């Protein structure tokens, strides 16, 4: 069973000096964009969006984690970075999130299940029920996760 989803979002400095409003803006001349390396999930998802849109990004840096991407944006080394919506939410007022509709082509969906070999299947099922119940879904939504 899937319990949550996460989509890409563009992280920009709070004042958005490069005036980024779309994924295509990231390919404009002079825009310094940072992405995750292709072997990390956020990098793979970014490549998927590039392929589906025909927008070719020329990043100034490919990082090994979303934290590193966010650090480049918050330090002023980049005008924008492509990360997950949840990462933008976690960063608080350090960045502004710019959603873009093309991210729907690269949604990460997260599964949850009680393992067959679990030592305490009853407790495991209670946890699954908590995460997938109303309270769990609200906590996930508050963190920026979407419905599965």
Name the predicted role of every residue range.
Residues 4-148:
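Exported/periplasmic ABC-transporter solute-binding proteins
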């Amino acid at each position: 069973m899937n319990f949550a989803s996460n989509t890409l979002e563009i992280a920009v400095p709070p004042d958005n000096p490069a005036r980024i409003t779309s994924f295509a803006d990231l390919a404009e001349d002079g825009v310094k964009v940072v992405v995750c390396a292709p072997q990390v999930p956020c990098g793979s998802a970014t490549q998927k969006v590039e392929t589906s849109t025909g927008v070719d990004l020329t990043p100034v840096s490919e990082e090994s984690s979303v934290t590193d991407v966010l650090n480049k944006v918050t330090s002023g080394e980049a005008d924008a970075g492509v990360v997950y919506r949840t990462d933008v939410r976690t960063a608080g007022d350090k960045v502004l999130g710019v959603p873009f509709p093309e991210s729907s082509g690269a949604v990460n969906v997260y599964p949850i299940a009680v393992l067959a070999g679990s030592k305490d299947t009853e407790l495991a099922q209670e946890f699954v029920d908590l995460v997938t119940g109303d309270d769990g879904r609200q906590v996930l939504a508050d963190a920026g996760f979407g419905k599965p």
